[in-house]
Each structure stands twice: as structure tokens, then as C-alpha cells.
Regions:
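Mature, Sec-exported extracytoplasmic domains of Gram-positive
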Residues: 1-230
Length: 230
């Protein structure tokens, strides 16, 4: 899968205004799980909550576990730390069992109080569905701009939606005149995916969505405090 692009920015006096100090900043690199949450915030936010309310009140504990990376680590403390690095908060994460769907009778991961870890449930029926979030995510293509302030920075990307299919290729699209099935269409038209997207971008970059990420420095981390689509 594609994740939010990582890029190193060197900004003179960007944050340390005294003494001409230069700071090297790494734009946070989000995985598929986080990028899925951002898509759902834009397109599955039925109560039209703002970003802060959405991540704290608009998603379930089960979905918070998913975004925290339960499919990558079994330690509850690590899951809390992952959320802290992304949002500057644990989002009041609770050590409950993890279910793919709320209606499931069996959890995929069972929480073990004695070890403070999650154990995979061998009795669960195998499924390709990992969460009840929509199986689509944000695909950032190119950085449009970076704006600095005293507390952090704002990054705007040109990007697309990516629709994931567990039994087929992922489709990146603007829901209009750009549509590409990654790793599949190239066998039909002979073009690489990179070439197709670069041609579409060069033809009219405004055909791409604009995704804006607002970061604030909290301790040593740059945490996401807002996300918008222009």
C-alpha cells in the first residue's frame, strides 16, 4: 500500500529563531491504517465533527486500536505510544478485545491483563476484513506547499483517494477523470503507474485533491492537530 510520503525539510530559522539555528524536520510518515482513518474522517463522518472531536469521540475504541497498529504490535503500551506520537494523546484508548466487526462473536485479539498484551485468537474465523472502517485511504502524491509557524508547520499535498480491494488491485482516483488500478492497468496500456500519474499531474495538477495537514510540536514529536481537503 501507499502511505503518506515522508520528506525531510531543512528550514533556516523555521522554529529556532535565535542564533540562526537550522532544524531538520521529518514529516510524519503515516501507514495504511492512519491513512484509512483520514479518508473516513472526510467521507464517513456522519455527524460532521471537526478533526479533534472525530478522533476523540467519532471513532470507537476498536477503531483506535486499529489506527494504533494492533496488527503490528501486541503490547498495549506500544499502542498507546503510537497514538501519542501521532496525535499527542492516547485518545483515552482502553485495553479491550479487538473485533473486526462489532457484530462478531469472537475477537481477533484478546487482551491479557496479566501481560498487558494482546493474544491472537486461534478460534476466530479467518477474514480479509480488518476493520469496520471504509477500505479506502488517502494517497499523497506531491507536496504543494509547506508553511511554518512558531508551533509547527502546515503541509499541503496534491493527492488522490485510494480504494482498496482485498481480492483485486487498489484504485487511485479523483472520482472524476483520473482512475488507475495500480499494478494492473500497466499490463493493459504498457504505461507504468508512475508515468500515468505524472502525465495526469503535468496535464492539470488541479485535477488532484489538496490535502492539508496541520502539525504542532509536542515535546519531540510533531503531532497532527487538523486535517482538511480543499
Amino acid at each position: 500500500y501507499f502511505s503518506v510520503g515522508k520528506e525531510v525539510i531543512k528550514e533556516n530559522n523555521g522554529f529556532n529563531t535565535k542564533g540562526g539555528i537550522k532544524e531538520v524536520i521529518n514529516i510524519p510518515d503515516y501507514n495504511y491504517y492512519m491513512s484509512t482513518l483520514l479518508y473516513n474522517y472526510l467521507n464517513n463522518n456522519k455527524d460532521k465533527l471537526n478533526f479533534n472531536d472525530y478522533i476523540n469521540k467519532g471513532i470507537t475504541n476498536n477503531q483506535k486500536l486499529y489506527v494504533a497498529g494492533i496488527f503490528g504490535t501486541s503490547k498495549f503500551n506500544d499502542l498507546e505510544e503510537n497514538l501519542n506520537k501521532i496525535f499527542g494523546s492516547t485518545l483515552n484508548l482502553k485495553p479491550d478485545d479487538y473485533y473486526s466487526w462489532p457484530s462478531d462473536e469472537q475477537p481477533v485479539y484478546k487482551y491479557n491483563k496479566e501481560t498487558n498484551m494482546y493474544d491472537y485468537n486461534d478460534d476466530v474465523i479467518g477474514t480479509d476484513v480488518l476493520t469496520d472502517l471504509l477500505d479506502s485511504y488517502i494517497y499523497n502524491y506531491k507536496i504543494k506547499s509547506v508553511e511554518y509557524n512558531d508551533n509547527g508547520f502546515i503541509v499541503t499535498y496534491y493527492g488522490l483517494y485510494a480504494h482498496f480491494d482485498s481480492v483485486g488491485p487498489t484504485c487511485v482516483t479523483n472520482n472524476s477523470n483520473i482512475e488507475r488500478y495500480l499494478g494492473y492497468d500497466s499490463t493493459e496500456d504498457g504505461l507504468t503507474d508512475e508515468y500515468y500519474l505524472s502525465e495526469a499531474f503535468n496535464k492539470n495538477k488541479d485535477d488532484f485533491f489538496k490535502f492539508t495537514y496541520t502539525y504542532k510540536k509536542v515535546n519531540k514529536n510533531y503531532v497532527l492537530i487538523d486535517f482538511k481537503q480543499e
